[in-house]
Amino acid sequence: MIYCQHAGMNKYILACDIGGTFTDIVLRGNGTVRTLKASSTPDDYSRAILSAVDEIRDSLGIDPGQIEAVVHATTVATNTILEHKGAKTALITTEGFRDVLEMRRLRIPVMYDLQYDKPAPLVPRRHRFEVSERLGADGKIKLALDEGQVREIAGRLQQEGIESVAVCLLHSYVNSVHEKRIGDILANELGGKVYVSLSSDILPEIREYERTSTAVVNAYIGPVVRDYVQSLSTRLKQTGVMGPLHIMQSNGGTMSAAAAAAKPAFLVESGPAAGVIACASMARSAGLDNVISFDMGGTTAKAAMVENGEPARTTEYEVGAGINVSSKLVKGGGYAIKLPFIDISEIGAGDDGDAGRDAESLRTDGGADGVARAHNASAGGAVIVGGFVQNTGGDGDLLVGEDPADRGNGLKNGVGVRGINNFDGSDRGEILTE
C-alpha cells in the first residue's frame, strides 16, 4: 500500500510526484491539504521539490522542520532506460552463459519480419565476462570460484571505465556464496567506485534470462538513481526537512531512500503506480469495483485495470521497447524485469506535433493562427490556442475555441501560458511567445 500516516498536530507530510513535464506537490497535515503544480526541472529533478519546500515556508509560514515525512514518486528510473542514459555497465556470469542476455526468449514483437533486430543489450558483448565456477541445482559447490580470474576482470573493468556491474551466476538463487564473494572482491579491488548489483539480492529466483536481465537493468540505472535519491535526501535535510524520504515502488508500496539506491529496478513504474493506487481508492469510495485507471501525463499516457477493487498486478514486465507494456502485452521487444509491478501499459504522448485552428477547420500542421506545440519537459506544458489559453492535461492536449470572452484570459494568437497552480489557490502564468 501507499505510505500513509496521520500527521500530528502542526506536523505535515509532503508528497511529490515528478513527471516528465510537471511536478505535483501535495502537503497534508494540521487538518488541511494544499497542492502545487510546477514545471519539472529535468536538468535537476530535485530542484522542483526544493523550490516547493521554499514556497511552503514563504507562502504558508510552515517551518520545514514540521514536515515529518516526504513521499516521492518519480520517473527517473524509467526515463534513464528509455533515454539510454544509464551507466556504462558490465556483466559477470558463469562460464558458458555470457550470451544469455542477448539470446533472450523466443518472443518477438513481430512474427513475420525477417529484417527484425532484437534490441541491443544494455551490456555489449565485450563487457560481458565469464568466470570459472559452478553450483549445482541444489546449491552445492561443484567448482570453486576462481578468485584470481575475478581480480583480473576487476582490472579490465577499471581499464574500460565501467561504472556499474551486474553479477548473475548459475543457481545463485539457491546459494549466493560465489556472487557475494565476487561483490567483495570488486569492492576491494575497485575501492567501491563501481556500483555492484547481485542477482541474488535483486531476484533470487529460477530462470536465467529473467534474473540476468533484471540484474542488468538494476545495474544500468543504479548509479543514476542512487545519486539522485542521495542528493535529494541530503538537500532536503539542508533545507530543514528532517523527516525520512520514502520512494514509491512499482508495486504500489514504498521503500526507504537507501533501499531505492540499492534496488532501483523496483522503481521503474514508481510514478504511474501511485496514480493507479489513488484511482482504486477513489473507485472504492464511489462503490465501483471494476474500473480503468487512465493517467494522461505530459510525455506518456498510462492505463491499468482495477478489478474487484484492487489494481491488477504482475511479476512479468518489459521496459524500453519504446513503451512499457503490461504482462498481457509482453512480446520480447524490451528489457525483461521480473519484479512485482502494478500491471500498467504506458505509451508516449507524442513528439513535436503541431495543432491549430484556421478560419474554417482544425489544422494539425501548425501555423500562425493559433498554434499548439508539444514541448519537452524543460519547456513545460505550453498550450497556445487561437484566441484564448486553456491549461490542459498534457503537452499535446488542445482545446480550440473562437470566442475569447467564453474563456477569459484572452491573448493574441501565437502567445501561450505556462500555468502554475499555487498553494493559495491562485493561478499565475508565464507568458511564452512563439
PLM segments and residue spans:
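Polybasic, low-complexity intrinsically disordered segments
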Residues: D395-L399, G410-E434
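N-terminally biased helix-coil "hinge/interface" segments that flank
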Residues: I2-R357, G366, R373, A379
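Generic low-complexity, intrinsically disordered sequence content enriched
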Residues: P64, G86, G161, T392, ...
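Short linear motifs in low-complexity or flexible loops
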Residues: A355-T364, A368, A372-A382, T392-G393, ...
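Acidic, glycine-rich loop-and-strand cores that form catalytic or ligand-binding grooves
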Residues: V385
